């Protein structure tokens, strides 16, 4: 076997660039490796938000969107944009999957249950979509419409759900067609790391109306949670009961519509509702519902899909496969789906010649408790892969900046950035020994802003800041005005490979002769 000189793409998740030093964990971190690379190698800033990644103008980027754009080499119009457009055009009200579920529930005298992240965050869901769904169900004649609200506080300020809950309480009153049935923090309902002890609590809340707490209206329930010192993300499962103290349960022939459009945090709880062989926890009840997912969460999840994904051909992974190249995808649990499923344009199956390495993220309640996460183990495996000379291309994601950034803990975020910097030093050294090269970038910002200047609260959400782009390799210049979709064609060009017509991104690096 000929020894390969790998081209590595290192994605520093949640690592944006911000001039302002206030609450900027990346600026305050001691990062000698990255400082040295920026001083001595071609680098610039590229865009990972808004129209540049297929999101509405001004919308912050996120990991799913970022990796789809990175891997596909074109601007991919995201589900948020597609679904909002369908609502504007009136097509949403005629969506076959949604109409079928609502009509079936009405015909069986059942209820329409709508669940999802009630948030204007636009990362996993958008509350405007949830409102459109409630209005559509009522318009079709449903009188028992129940909202199971997952609360955010991660892609939004930590205590910001009150306005949304008040608005939806008023919406139901005006439609006279149901009510908010439960509230629960996303920590429970949207886990993606097999922490079934959390998910079962959300499942029991939705299926049986059993929560740790109860209240007669959602805003009171939220105020009680705040009094218990629970921010939105961590609100304990709370049933909203009627005047008789009765909660809402999920029954056979009801419709269950999941309004999250992003797959990774929707999969686990979806499987608990739909998989006959589900083994994550003991289910007290298993109602047979008309289940609809807003987008396809995974090929093996049973249910109708309101907005099937658009097929992306000739992504970077596919082009490498067709050229007979070998590739490695590697990350921790938290971002493994991003360097595989999302980077491959929503395809689960690995391409020929594509290996995958999953490093378990630490089992801690929140990552500020272990800001280095599993970066050392990840880097051990990555360096080993580089030294093996088996791979033409390596795609690696370091989750720390994002996952610790989401906690709002500034000191922990600084430590997270420092841990990643140390790891990058090891990777760059390993690449140098085998004649490899690397590109360093990020999918979106986060850790560069840890406090919200307007509210004074911790800033736990992503940002719309530009992200770094560094080329560690030959003498070269970098074009300005780049975006994430330019990375894949740039990589192919560095490898001397043809760029397919579907990749509309630009080549950002010009090698100096």
Swiss-Prot record:
Enzyme's top EC category: isomerase
Annotated cofactor note: Binds 2 manganese ions per subunit.
Known EC number: 5.4.2.12
Residues reported in the UniProt entry to bind Mn(2+) 1: 402, 406, 462
Active site per database record: 63
Cellular component, GO annotation: cytosol
Residues the entry annotates as binding substrate: 124, 154-155, 186, 192, 262-265, 335
GO biological process: glucose catabolic process; glycolytic process
UniProt subunit comment: Monomer.
Stated name of the protein: 2,3-bisphosphoglycerate-independent phosphoglycerate mutase
């Amino acid at each position: 076997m000929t020894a390969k000189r790998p081209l590595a793409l290192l994605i520093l998740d949640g690592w944006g660039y911000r001039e302002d030093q206030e609450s900027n964990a990346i600026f305050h971190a001691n990062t000698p490796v990255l400082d040295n690379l920026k001083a001595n190698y071609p680098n610039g800033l590229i865009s990972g938000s808004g129209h540049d990644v297929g999101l509405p103008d001004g919308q912050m980027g996120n990991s799913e969107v970022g990796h789809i754009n990175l891997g596909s080499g074109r601007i991919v119009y995201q589900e948020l944009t597609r679904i909002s457009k369908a609502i504007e055009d009136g097509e949403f009200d005629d969506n076959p999957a949604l109409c079928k579920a609502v009509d079936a529930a009405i015909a069986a005298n059942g209820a329409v249950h709508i669940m999802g992240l009630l948030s204007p965050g636009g990362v996993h869901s958008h509350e405007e979509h949830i409102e459109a769904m409630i209005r559509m169900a009522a318009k079709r004649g449903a009188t028992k419409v129940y909202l199971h609200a997952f609360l955010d506080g991660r892609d939004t300020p930590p205590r910001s759900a009150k306005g949304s809950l008040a608005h939806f309480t008023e919406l139901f009153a005006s439609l006279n067609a149901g009510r908010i049935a439960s509230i629960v923090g996303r920590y429970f309902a949207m886990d993606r790391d097999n922490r079934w002890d959390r998910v079962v609590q959300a499942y029991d809340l939705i299926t049986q109306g059993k929560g740790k707490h109860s209240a007669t209206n959602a805003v009171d329930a939220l105020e009680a949670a705040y009094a218990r010192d629970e921010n939105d993300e961590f609100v304990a499962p709370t049933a909203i009961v009627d005047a008789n103290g009765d909660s809402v349960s999920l029954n056979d022939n009801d419709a269950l519509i999941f309004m999250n459009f992003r797959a990774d945090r929707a999969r686990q709880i979806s499987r608990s509702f739909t998989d006959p062989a589900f083994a994550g926890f003991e289910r007290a009840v298993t109602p047979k519902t008309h289940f609809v997912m807003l987008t396809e969460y995974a090929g093996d999840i049973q249910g109708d899909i309101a907005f099937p994904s658009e097929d992306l051909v000739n992504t970077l992974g596919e082009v490498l496969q067709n050229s007979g190249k070998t590739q490695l995808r590697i990350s921790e649990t938290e971002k493994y789906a991003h360097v595989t499923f999302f980077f491959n344009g929503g395809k689960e199956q690995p391409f020929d010649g594509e290996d995958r390495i999953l490093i378990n993220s630490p089992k801690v309640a929140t990552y500020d408790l272990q800001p280095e996460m599993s970066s050392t183990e990840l880097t051990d495996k990555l360096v080993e892969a580089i030294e093996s000379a088996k791979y033409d291309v390596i795609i690696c994601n370091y989750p720390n900046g994002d996952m610790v950034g989401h906690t709002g803990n500034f000191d922990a975020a600084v430590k997270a950035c420092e841990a990643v910097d140390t790891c990058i030093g090891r990777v760059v050294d390993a690449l140098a020994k085998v004649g490899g090269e690397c590109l360093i970038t990020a999918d979106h910002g986060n850790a560069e802003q840890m406090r919200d200047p307007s509210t004074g609260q911790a800033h736990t959400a992503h940002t719309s800041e530009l992200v770094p782009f560094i080329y560690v390799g030959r003498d070269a210049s970098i074009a300005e005005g780049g975006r994430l979709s330019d990375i894949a064609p740039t990589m192919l060009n560095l490898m001397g490979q043809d760029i397919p017509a579907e990749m509309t991104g630009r080549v950002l690096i010009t090698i100096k002769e």
